[in-house]
Every structure is written in structure tokens, then in C-alpha cells.
């Protein structure tokens, strides 16, 4: 979590950590989902969701296909997930989405403004980044760059 005088704190976590009380966030933190197609139980865990900041559908589909192919080749679930990211150039494509998609840019600017005004935010997705790569880490880096 980063702290700047007069500015909100920024964190990221995954939904299961919130559901099982595995993460320590200040009580005033707004839980912002960044999931393209959230489940009802995801909605029940977060305060809001910004689907525009989730990876675009075509990127999710190509990553899932690569992941399944890698599992067939014998990689474990986590290994296949992480290798699929490299295979489809996930990071580069997601960063491009944040730059070129009007809804994503608007949502990103809104989060940056909220942080500047003092609101503390935690970006929430499904992946435990101790074992799997997740777009929310890229999103957090982007927000931190805008704050610098």
C-alpha cells in the first residue's frame, strides 16, 4: 500500500482474500472490482465494479485458450496460466487496452481523481498474485505512475 500526504492509499487484493479475511485494509477503503464479467458473489464482496478496467473479452478468450492448450501439454493450472500470459503477450495487450479504450481511460482517470482527493482504494479481481499473474497489478502500476 502506498501513502502520500493528502492522497488516498492504493492497494490491490483478490476476492477470496476478502471473503476469508486474509487481507488487512483500512476500514474506509473502497473495494473496487476490476472484472469484465463478475459473478453475483463477486458483486456481494466489492463496493463497486468497473468492467471497463477488466481485460477485453478477446484477450481473455485468447489467454484461456492458450492456458487450456498448455494444460493439455502437462503444465499445472498456475504454470499454464502464467505461461499463457507470455504466449498471448497479455501485459502489452492489456496496457494497450488501457491506453486506447475510451471507457477504460475514463475509468482510470476517475480512479486517479478519487485517489488524489483522498479516497483509499483497493483494486479487486479473482487471482491470487502469489501464484498467478493478474491484470490488476498492471492497473495498480499504471495508477501509481499517474500519482508520481
Label the model's feature ranges.
Residues 2-148:
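Residues lining hydrophobic/aromatic ligand-binding pockets adjacent to catalytic sites
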Amino acid at each position: 500500500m502506498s501513502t502520500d500526504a493528502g492522497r488516498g492509499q492504493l492497494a490491490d487484493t483478490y476476492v477470496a482474500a476478502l471473503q476469508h479475511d486474509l487481507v488487512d485494509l483500512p476500514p474506509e477503503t473502497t473495494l473496487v472490482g476490476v472484472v469484465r464479467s463478475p459473478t453475483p458473489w463477486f458483486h456481494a464482496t466489492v463496493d463497486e465494479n468497473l468492467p471497463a478496467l477488466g481485460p477485453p473479452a478477446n484477450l481473455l478468450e485468447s489467454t484461456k485458450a492458450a492456458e487450456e492448450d498448455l494444460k493439455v501439454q502437462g503444465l499445472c493450472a498456475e504454470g499454464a496460466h502464467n505461461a499463457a500470459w507470455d504466449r498471448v503477450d497479455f501485459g502489452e495487450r492489456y496496457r494497450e487496452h488501457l491506453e486506447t479504450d475510451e471507457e477504460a481511460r475514463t475509468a482510470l482517470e476517475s480512479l486517479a481523481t478519487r485517489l488524489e482527493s483522498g479516497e483509499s482504494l483497493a483494486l479487486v479481481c479473482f487471482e491470487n498474485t502469489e501464484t498467478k499473474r493478474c491484470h490488476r497489478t498492471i492497473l495498480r502500476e499504471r495508477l501509481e505512475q499517474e500519482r508520481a
